[in-house]
Structure formats: C-alpha cells, structure tokens
C-alpha cells in the first residue's frame, strides 16, 4: 500500500503573531496527525483482521485510561482557578461521574464487543512496550514542560473530529463485528473534542506572546503527534509485519 507523506511545513519563519502560530499549528496537523498513518488507513478501510482490531483496541485502552491522569497533572500545574475549573470537565469526560459513564467506560464497551476479557484489558499486561513508553512520555511531558506547552500538547484535538467520523463510517461499513453500540466512544468525541480544542487554541493564542513561546507551542504539538504516531508504528510492526514482542497480546489467528 502506498501512502503520500509528502505534505511538508512551510519554510521556517518567525512566528510574529497568534495568527502565524495558528497557521503553523494547522500545517503541523495536516502533515503529522496520525490519520495519515498506514495502520489507520487499514483500520478504516476494512483491511485488518478481527485480531488486529483487538490489538489496536487493547493497546489504545492504555492511552485512554491515562488521559485523565495526564489531565490531572495539567490541572496541578495551574494556580489560576478559572483554568483548573475549565480543565476539570476533561476528567469527567474520561473517568465519568457518579451515575454517568465516561470515555473509559465506552472504550471498554468496545473491547467487550470485540471479545476481549475486560479484566485482561484493564490489567494492561498485554500492551506493547512502545505503547507504554509513548503514553508515559506524554504524562512526563505535561509534568515537566511549561504549563503553556502542557496545554499546547492537547491541540491534536483540533484534528480529531475528522478521524472519528472516518472511523465510525469506515468500521461500521467494513466489519461485521462492529456495531453502533461499540462505537459510542467515537460518537461522543465528535462533540467533546471540538469544545476542548477551541479552549486550548484560545489559551495558546492568548498566552504565547513571544516568537519563542509560539515556537514552543508548535513543538509541543509536534511532540504529541509523535506520541500518537509511535503507537501506530508499534501496532503495525507487531500485528501487520508479525513481530509481536514477548509478553504482548497475540491474536488467535497468530497463535
């Protein structure tokens, strides 16, 4: 399968305004967001086996269940009460609230529907080493870099609605083991992600006031795209090329 990855960023130029920074951010998304990865093209095009889809959902669960941990770290970086209040809803979006399911619950509906044992999924013992390292690197990034960069790293949400829509239509049309119930996570993110992205974009536009700060925002987004891309590289290497590392989940057709 051929894939055009020729999209490149504009030549380096000083980011003298918020508009210039936003333009650069959108270029980064167009060139580097993981909707361009071959594994996602296979997933959405119906080219994967059920076992390969199981491996994707199992590994992605580690990312999903770590997102509220990441968001709690982001909240801890701010003395500003208004920012903490704004960011707090992200915890409930993923963890849920009393009497209301969250994104992690919806992801487990997906893995249940794919026939994976819930206790095994939640243990994360079968995930790929690269999945664990990439996700943990994301948590470390928001902990160790500036609060501005922590928020900027979430800007992949600018590009998420398109991939969610493609995933919903593609997987429903191509896989007989997928139904609307198990795709509930992605359906909900169609409205949650734009809200989150709008806030994060406004924040970096308002608070990145120098060319250096705007460059740091752009580099934070690049880092996040690398976190996402690395996870798909690992899935492709293990479950398409067949190099499953010791201790990782092995689909039935590969046993």
UniProtKB/Swiss-Prot annotation:
It catalyses: 6-(2-amino-2-carboxyethyl)-7,8-dioxo-1,2,3,4,7,8-hexahydroquinoline-2,4-dicarboxylate + 3 O2 = pyrroloquinoline quinone + 2 H2O2 + 2 H2O + H(+). GO terms for molecular function: pyrroloquinoline-quinone synthase activity. Its EC number is 1.3.3.11. It comes from the Bacteria. Gene3D superfamilies: Heme oxygenase-like. Pathway: Cofactor biosynthesis; pyrroloquinoline quinone biosynthesis. Signal peptide: none annotated. Keywords: Oxidoreductase, PQQ biosynthesis. GO terms for biological process: pyrroloquinoline quinone biosynthetic process; sulfur compound metabolic process. PANTHER family: 4-AMINOBENZOATE SYNTHASE, PQQC-LIKE PROTEIN. Ring cyclization and eight-electron oxidation of 3a-(2-amino-2-carboxyethyl)-4,5-dioxo-4,5,6,7,8,9-hexahydroquinoline-7,9-dicarboxylic-acid to PQQ. Belongs to the PqqC family. This is Pyrroloquinoline-quinone synthase.
């Amino acid at each position: 399968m051929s894939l055009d990855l020729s999209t490149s960023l504009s030549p380096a130029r000083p980011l003298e305004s918020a508009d210039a920074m936003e333009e650069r951010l959108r270029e980064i998304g167009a060139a580097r967001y993981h909707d361009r990865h071959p594994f996602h093209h296979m997933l959405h095009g119906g080219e994967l086996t059920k076992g390969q889809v199981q491996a994707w959902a199992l590994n992605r669960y580690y990312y999903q269940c770590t997102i509220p941990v990441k968001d709690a770290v982001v909240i801890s970086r701010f003395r500003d009460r208004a920012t903490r209040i704004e960011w707090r809803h992200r915890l409930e979006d993923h963890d849920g609230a009393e009497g209301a399911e969250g994104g992690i619950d919806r992801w487990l509906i997906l893995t249940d529907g794919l026939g994976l044992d819930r206790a095994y999924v939640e243990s994360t013992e079968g995930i790929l080493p690269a999945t664990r390292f990439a996700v943990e690197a994301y948590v470390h990034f928001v902990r160790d870099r500036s609060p501005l960069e922590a928020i900027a790293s979430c800007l992949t949400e600018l590009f998420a609605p398109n991939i969610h829509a493609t995933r919903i239509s593609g997987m429903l049309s191509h896989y007989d083991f997928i139904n609307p119930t198990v795709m509930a996570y992605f359906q909900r993110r169609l409205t949650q992600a734009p809200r989150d992205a709008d806030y994060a974009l406004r924040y970096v536009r308002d608070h990145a006031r120098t060319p250096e700060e705007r460059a740091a925002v752009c580099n934070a987004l690049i880092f996040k795209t690398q976190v996402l891309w690395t996870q798909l590289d690992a899935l492709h290497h293990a479950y398409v090329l067949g190099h499953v590392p010791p201790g990782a989940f092995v689909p039935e057709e590969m046993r």
